[in-house]
Amino acid sequence: MGSYLNPGNKGFRESLNSEIYVDKTGLIERTNALLDTREKYICVSRPRRFGKSMAADMLAAYYGQDTDSEALFQNLYIETCPSFREHLNKYNVVKLNMQDFLSASHSVQDMLGRIQKYVIFDLTDAYETIRYRDETDLVQVMKDVYAATKHPFIILIDEWDCLFREYQQDQDAQKKYLDFLRMWLKDKDYVSLAYMTGILPIKKYGTHSALNMFSEYSMINPREMAKFFGFTEAEVKNLCERYDRSFEETRAWYDGYEVLTVENNTQQVCELYSPKSVVEAMKSGIFDNYWNQTETYEALKVYVQLNFDGLKDAVVKMLAGERIPINTGTFSNDMTTFQCRDDVLTLLVHLGYLGYHWPDKTVFIPNKEIAQEYINAISMMDWHEVIDSINASKKLLEALWNGEEATVADGIDHAHSEISILQYNDENSLSCTIHLAFYTKKTIPHCTFPVRTR
């Protein structure tokens, strides 16, 4: 057992020991089906705190040699699957968190050198008797180990895209990194499965991907991987029953990620919840914005204030409850190459700041928690008319409760005239006005409009 080669099952054991653990071992059934096939290259991208690292720990515990993990999977879904024992602890696992290497390095070249040096150290330490052709070449060392042992490798890479987030403007560094991954992984007999996770999909240059052997499962199109990252509605209902929490309140705060999944060759929309936030709300009983503990509004502010091609108008409409059609096909899968408004909106989907509805190709603000992040972001910008309307919505709601009809009418008219995108006689514009005017209702828990009787 090494630091990077067959690191053991401690990470997965800690997940199991946590107060709340939701069984996602169905992912193993799926990866077992892909072993040693042309589909053995998998890249899963999700927002932060959607269970990506936990899944990598689980796969390391299941596949890795030099440890016995059978007891950890007792009473979990994968134990009932025919492939469970066939692959349990049968592989050499190389597990890397790229953020660890990047943080310890002064350059991309230094980072790539560290990766090769440290993995080679574990391999040559574990297989001392093998004669190596070149102990400084990671690809050749892994070829030699595989030739001598016939034990193939499972490669698990967490935070694969961290370099693209920290070296946003350095295309040379990005290409060096992608070239390294391609050289290490593509068309290699020693690879039984290569599994990468991150926030962003694989970077595209022009119309081509540098790692075109990977099947990608993103927030835009997660398909059969959808239910393994994030909590499903059924899982959240079970937690609400266990902790005696309001399911309706949980849904209002943390639901809204409508992703396309495939079950028994049938496409369907799956509702996903932000797991970190649900866990915090279940344990504390307090429905609040837990998103800002993983991301700050500054991250959102950077992209919203770009205001590409009517981006500001789109955000206002989404705050008012509307959905905006977008084309995700032009996005370059990085954080800087924006050609139009839709590229920015697509990035916000990958970051978790927008939901994406596959059937009609629209984006929307998914829930109260994320709506508050938008308010936090634009409150620090020069969107004064939007902030004024949101602040006025509190007074408008009070007037509605008090039956002050003239005040309500004036408030709606004011919101309509203040937001420049709204056309006075347009029906959809009126709907947007009313929703934005009553924004407060959407952000106050248990807030319902009273029914007046005469």
Regions found by a protein language model. Name each.
Residues 453-454:
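Short acidic loop-to-beta-strand element that houses the catalytic metal-binding Asp/Glu
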Residues 1-434, 438-447:
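Phosphate-binding site recognition
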